[in-house]
UniProtKB/Swiss-Prot annotation:
The modification Phosphoserine is found at residues 558, 561. InterPro entries: FANCI (IPR026171), FANCI_HD1 (IPR029310), FANCI_HD2 (IPR029312), FANCI_S1 (IPR029308), FANCI_S1-cap (IPR029305), FANCI_S2 (IPR029315), FANCI_S3 (IPR029313), FANCI_S4 (IPR029314). GO terms for cellular component: nucleoplasm. This is Fanconi anemia group I protein. The gene is FANCI. The modification Phosphothreonine is found at residue 567. The keyword Phosphoprotein applies.
Length: 1338
């Protein structure tokens, strides 16, 4: 039969063809098409023949065509045909479809919908035909039956799409359907249906099928709905990531059916999807714009949804497109800073923590992106690198005193900018570790910034470089040429940068001979440079090389393991590859350094400070270094035993014209000798063993040094100040050459005395004679110190009370203090009595300890041996703290003999030292605070590290200082020590930071602090301020301080009286600390300051309320509950704050800072009330919410308890200023011209103090304006509680007004409203602050 149809079709006889086809039943027709298709012969020709004999003009023809279409769809989807045959059949059917009438198209389209609903599609090939059918249907103008009514083609198509998107889809056909919809013209609404349906299908598909589906969706988004597509994709992968994380946290998942896919598979799929989206953005820039716009909007509502690891990765991949890079980085940096600020605000307030417990941390998300990028996400890495550097450059470390960047050592500050910088460094370091291809680029950029930003501190970049080198020292061999290029610029860099850079790349020097040789060449050239900085850089470099290239046989004991920062990497394989070469190399460097001993003092100083470390790390150089030092000191040592003084001081200075300079830092030289000799004797000499051949030579210089130091000690004790030409009559003026010379001499002599004190104490072995020598040396030191202080005092120098930087080492200071105050050994008693007999010496010892701790706190390191070794510094701090703590608690200040009241008492110095130590510990050793507190508790020395309860240990220390403070507060007025009380309060504040705010100890401490403030009528302003600041800092971590503020405000009101003198105030007192002396300005300003902080918290909450109010997501119930909780919290806070201000505005505050601060705080309060009212206006617009009763009460409270009182307070302020002006005028009349300046000053002060008044009135009126708006929206009359006042920021003087009007008849009446602002509430531009009034001249 098929052959006959083909033949008839070829003959071109339509009648016969139609007749033949009419004779076939539906089944026969189908079988014929199937047989022909399976044989693969002339299928298209057969179909064409059938269509030719089935004209659309005849009903039978249309019916037959439909039968063929239905059968072909089934045939194609059966999977029995070859792909080529399928394409041929579908192509022909698509061509013929446009000829079908509307009702046939409708029937065919309905068939497809049913097929899809049944899930009968196997390969989706027939869907190409479906798209053509729907397109043709949409163009049909024919009325089509649908249900009981009729629709046109377009409407019918819309109903079909709606039905299709509402029905169940077979997951296997989703991609085909998404592809099909691209070819159909869709309205915006239809497209939204389709996109939402496809997105809902994501969760039902196998993960591997997601990328091609995303690709189809992105192509489909060319029609529109870009935001929906992007939002759906991001949300899907965000949920997958969360589920994956949850499963990692709880690996034994009970619900095995919903176990997520393997991590690596998920990451690879995410990476592919990101690439698809980036490719789409490259083709259509609007998708990128829509992505940024969507994430910005979402970030305002829910940062956790907007900035998840997937979306951040997508943004960073997109940022490679330069047009969007700036927008993306600005958005990410803003988000990071905002996240840091929000966390900072939350951590400071228990009230906020309770209301908003879960807070999003964007930094953790970005670091997770770095971790995820390890799964082959090369497209993300460049964005990560750019973001990392952008964050680091947005912040520069501050320079501390002396120009050295302090951030390296001082730990991370809480500032958001610094946290952002730290995040940038973490991003770069982790990216460096994960992605090998980009390592050279990161290294290149870091080195470039170290060089080009040398004028500003680059410590954060050097720290990053250090960490990079530590993570992969061998990797740098590939970049050695770049490092070598950097060395060429060493001469032009500041010395701090040079030292940091060399320490950072030091591991590379051990594994790369070429880099080491390049550095040596650069350093040898620099050592002869004209520039002082270049020579210092050379010395720093050579010392580093000497420390790190050990000669075989050098000691490797623990005492030689001084850290030089985190960059220390031991490459032992290379360290001793050629010990002979190392020795020659080191001796050559020493030869170069010897030449530096004839250069400026700064260069010599670096050498003297560096030799000790070299000696400890490279002990085989001991002989060479000791010989060098011996020959150097001999130039200044006078061997004749009867000559005084024993050293040639004149050789230490150099004159250039009228200027005098220090040429040889003799005290530093002697200090270096003392430390090197002590180390040599205690270490090398004891380890010599069988090496007798060198022993004689070594004993020679050792004996020389000992004899020399012994002689210098003896003669220094004998020497009088006149021997140094430094008696009291000497000139110490810094403006004259003689004065400068004498100052240099004095500092050198004092330094030499200190060096000898340390030397003799160490070798004395508790000998009475030696300790007498120590005291003799101190006497010499002290005389000079007193003279310098006296001279500095006469010159009104700020350095008058500061001792010169001490030459004692930190280790020795801890030993000396322990001996003076804690050594109870009977054998030491007689010798120590010598030192203990001198109160001045003991005070000096504590003063030096204080100075050392201060230096450590400010610079992160101290002078002298081990000054840069964090471990040794920590141990020394623990020892010093134990001694100072014992000394302070054992001997109260009141019973201490303060030595003719000269200088601070030892107890007070101990207290200052303890405060600095506690601060330093929290800054530099935060991670080691448990060990520190354990070291102070001698009763629990053996506790395991894991068992240390920081809160308990800190509470124990706090109790000691509480007792001392109570003793101070209960002492007689004459015995009260204000300075000591302030220090105790500050120490308690510092230690309180170690308490867990949720602990019982914290609550006990807070209760105690409240009690102290309530029961002690303290009149010392500084102590009062300290106690209240402590109280507030504790209270905010326990609960909101508003009720506390109210009680304090009531006390201030009671103390200062009412603005209405006829009003009697109930004499009740909550806090005795609030009294006539402290109430204003001290307590008042503290209360206002704390109220401002509460207002800032409320403002932050209102912003979150606004964000929650604009969230229209499905999870509206949770948002609604959160909104109600926030609204309740805000209204309660504001309600109590209104009662605080209600008290203060009725208080007769003195003119000045209190009035000014109160007026400004009131303006803020009304501005925040206005923000709250705006929030409710917005809520009324978006929902049918009514005004809650709480808000109504708040408005009523503001209308009854605040606004009227504000106007009364304004009148009061104007009255007190009028009185002060009148008083000044009277004085002017009496003394005429002499007092003109006084009047001008008073007038300026009045103008300054009354400046906030117009702003306050404007804020009140803005509040009332928006209350009117809310009343209209909510149908609740809120204005019934507000009494409009005619009192504004002026008072009309009728007589003056008349005279002015007579004088200025010609003046336009428009100026009059400027003088009468009673109608300000109806200004044309409501958001503009009122203009300043013009002052008329009389």
């Amino acid at each position: 039969m098929a052959q006959r149809i083909l033949q008839l079709a070829a003959e071109g006889s339509p009648e016969r063809l139609q007749e033949a086809l009419q004779g076939l039943t539906e089944g026969e027709l189908g079988d014929m098409v199937t047989r022909q298709a399976l044989r693969g012969r002339e299928t298209a020709a057969l179909l064409k023949g059938i269509f030719k004999g089935s004209p659309c003009s005849q009903q039978s023809g249309v019916l037959r065509r439909l039968q063929v279409y239905k059968h072909c769809v089934s045939l194609v989807e059966s999977g029995d045909l070859h792909v080529g045959k399928v394409s041929e059949i579908i192509g022909l059917l698509m061509l013929e479809a446009r000829q079908l009438p509307g009702h046939a198209l409708a029937e065919l389209a309905t068939l497809f919908v049913e097929v899809i609903k049944r899930g009968s599609l196997s390969n989706g090939k027939s869907l190409e035909l479906f798209s053509t059918v729907l397109t043709a249907l949409s163009n049909s103008k024919e009325s089509l039956a649908y249900g009981k009514g009729e629709l046109n083609g377009e409407e019918f198509k819309k109903q079909l799409i709606n039905t299709l998107c509402s029905s169940k889809w077979d997951p296997q056909c989703v991609i085909h359907l998404a592809n099909m919809f691209r070819d159909i013209p869709l309205s915006g609404e239809e497209l939204q249906f389709v996109v939402e349906k496809v997105l809902r299908m994501f969760s039902k598909l196998d993960l591997q099928e997601i990328p091609p589906l995303v690709y189809q969706l992105l192509l489909l988004s060319a029609k529109g709905s870009k935001k929906t597509v992007l939002e759906g994709i991001i949300s899907f992968f965000n949920q997958l990531d969360k589920r994956q994380k949850e499963e990692q946290r709880v690996p034994q998942s009970a619900d095995l059916e919903v176990a997520t896919v393997p991590l690596d598979q998920l990451r690879h799929v995410e990476g592919t999807v990101i690439l698809h989206i980036v490719s789409a953005i490259n083709l259509d820039q609007d998708i990128g714009e829509e992505l940024i716009k969507h994430l910005k909007t979402e970030q305002q509502k829910d940062p956790g949804k907007a900035l998840c690891p997937f979306s951040v990765s997508l943004l960073l991949s997109t940022a490679v497109k330069h047009r969007l890079q700036e927008q993306i980085f600005d958005f990410l940096k803003t988000s990071i800073t905002r996240s840091c600020k929000d966390l900072q605000i939350l951590q400071a307030s228990k009230f906020l923590q309770d209301l908003c417990p879960q807070q999003y941390d964007v930094t953790a998300v970005i670091l997770e992106v770095v971790k995820n990028s390890a799964f082959g996400w090369d497209h993300v890495t460049q964005g990560l690198v750019d973001l990392g550097f952008s964050l680091m450059e947005s912040y520069e470390p501050k320079k501390s005193f002396g120009g050295k960047a302090a951030e390296t050592n001082l730990g991370l500050s809480k500032m958001p900018a610094q946290q952002a910088c730290k995040l940038g460094a973490s991003i770069l370091l982790e990216t460096f570790k994960v992605h090998e291809p980009i390592r050279s680029d990161i290294l290149e950029q870091v080195l470039n910034r170290v060089l080009t930003k040398a004028a500003s501190p680059v410590s954060h970049f050097i720290d990053l470089l250090s960490n990079i080198v530590v993570s992969a020292p061998l990797v740098l061999q590939n970049s050695s040429s770049r490092v070598t290029e950097t060395f060429d610029n060493l001469s032009f860099l500041p010395i701090d940068t040079v030292q940091g850079l060399l320490r950072a790349v030091q591991p590379l020097l051990k594994v790369s001979m070429s880099v080491r040789d390049s550095l040596i060449l650069v350093l040898q050239k620099a050592i002869f440079s004209r520039q002082l900085d270049a020579r210092k850089a050379a010395v720093a470099g050579f010392l580093l090389l000497l420390r790190n290239f050990k000669i075989l046989g050098s000691l490797t004991s623990s005492q030689c393991s001084q850290a030089i920062g985190a960059t220390q990497v031991q490459a032992d394989v290379h360290a001793c590859y050629n010990s002979a070469a190392n020795e020659a190399f080191c001796l050559e460097i020493l030869g170069s350094l010897r030449r530096c001993l004839s250069q400026q003092a700064d260069v010599r100083l670096m050498l003297y400070e560096g030799f000790y470390d070299v000696l400890r790390r490279n002990s085989q150089l001991a002989s060479s270094i000791m010989e060098t030092l011996l020959s150097q000191i001999k130039q200044y040592y006078l061997p004749q035993q009867d000559l005084l003084p024993p050293l040639k001081l004149e050789g230490c200075i150099m004159a250039q014209g009228d200027q005098i300079f220090l040429q040889e830092p003799l005290a530093h030289l002697l200090c270096c000798i003392q430390h090197c000799l002590a180390w040599y004797k205690s270490t090398v000499h004891l380890c010599k063993g069988a090496e007798d051949e060198e022993e004689e030579e070594d004993v020679g210089f050792e004996q020389n040094f000992e004899e020399m130091l012994e002689s210098v000690t003896r003669r220094m004790i004998k020497s009088e100040l006149e021997d140094f030409e430094l008696d009291k009559s000497a000139d110490f003026s810094p403006s004259s050459g003689v004065g400068v010379k004498n100052n240099i001499y004095a500092i050198q002599v004092m330094g030499i005395c200190e060096v000898l004190i340390e030397y003799n104490f160490k070798i004395g072995n508790f000998s009475k004679n030696k300790f007498e020598d120590v005291l003799g040396l101190f006497t010499c030191y002290n005389k000079l110190s007193e003279i310098l202080k006296e001279k500095a005092g006469k010159n009104k120098s700020t350095l008058g009370n500061r001792i010169a930087r001490s030459f004692l080492s930190m280790g020795f200071v801890s030993t000396l203090l322990t001996a003076l105050f804690r050594d109870n050994a009977q054998s030491h008693e007689e010798s120590l009595a010598v030192l203990r007999s001198s109160t001045e010496f003991m005070r000096y010892a504590v003063s030096v300890a204080l100075q050392k701790v201060q230096q450590l706190e400010e610079m992160g390191q101290t002078d002298g041996p081990d000054g840069q070794n964090p471990e040794k510094m920590f141990q020394n701090l623990c020892k010093i703290t134990r001694v100072l703590l014992w000394r302070y608690t054992s001997i109260p200040t009141a019973v201490e003999e303060s030595g003719k009241k000269k200088g601070k008492s030892i107890s007070l110095l101990c207290l200052e030292g303890l405060l600095r130590i506690f601060n330093t510990m929290q800054q530099l050793y935060a991670a080691r605070i448990p060990q520190f507190l354990q070291a102070l508790d001698i009763t629990d020395g053996d506790a395991e590290e894991a068992d240390i309860n920081v809160t308990e240990k800190a509470a124990f220390q706090i109790r000691q200082f509480q007792r001392s403070l109570v003793n101070q507060l209960s002492s007689a007025e004459d015995d009260f020590n204000s300075k000591e009380t302030q220090l105790l309060i500050t120490i308690l504040s510092t230690l309180s930071k170690l308490l867990d705010p949720g602990s019982q100890q914290f609550l006990q401490f807070l209760t105690w602090t409240v009690k102290i403030c309530k029961e002690n009528a303290l009149e010392d302003l500084s102590c009062c301020k300290g106690l209240l600041t402590l109280l507030f800092s504790l209270h905010v971590l326990y609960k909101s301080p508003v009720s506390l503020l109210r009680e304090l405000a009531q006390d201030i009101h009671a103390c200062l009286g009412d603005i209405d003198q006829d009003v009697e105030i109930e004499s009740r007192s909550h806090f005795a600390i609030v009294n006539v002396k402290t109430a204003a300005p001290t307590v008042c300003l503290l209360v206002l300051g704390q109220a401002d902080k509460v207002l800032e918290e409320v403002d932050w909450l209102i912003k979150r309320l606004t964000i929650l109010g604009s969230d229209t997501s499905e999870d509206s119930t949770q948002a609604s509950n959160q909104t109600q909780a926030l609204e309740k919290g805000v209204i309660l806070q504001l309600g109590t704050l209104l009662t605080v201000f209600h008290e203060l505005v009725q208080t007769a505050l003195p003119a000045g800072s209190c009035v000014d601060s109160l007026l400004r705080s009131l303006s803020k309060t009304y501005a925040i009330l206005t923000s709250l009212i705006k929030h409710y206006i917005q809520a009324c617009r978006s929902t049918s919410n009514t005004v809650p009763g709480r808000l109504e009460k708040l408005v009523k409270l503001s209308g009854s308890h605040l606004t009227p009182q504000c106007y009364s307070f304004i009148t009061y302020v104007q009255n007190i200023h009028s009185e002060s002006l009148s008083f000044a005028e009277e004085k002017k009349k009496k003394k005429k011209e002499d007092e003109t300046a006084v009047v001008s000053t008073v007038m300026a002060k009045v103008l300054r103090d009354t400046k906030p008044i117009p702003n306050l009135i404007f804020a009140i009126e803005q509040y009332e304006k928006f209350l009117i708006h809310l009343s209209k929206k909510s149908k609740v009359n809120l204005m019934q509680y507000m009494k409009l006042s005619t009192s504004r920021d002026f008072r009309i003087n009728a007589s003056m007004l008349d005279s002015v009007l007579q004088e200025q008849n010609t003046e336009d009446a428009e100026n009059e409203p400027d003088n009468n602002q009673s109608g300000t509430a109806e200004q044309p531009d409501e958001n503009q602050e009122p203009q300043k009034k013009r002052r008329r001249k009389k």
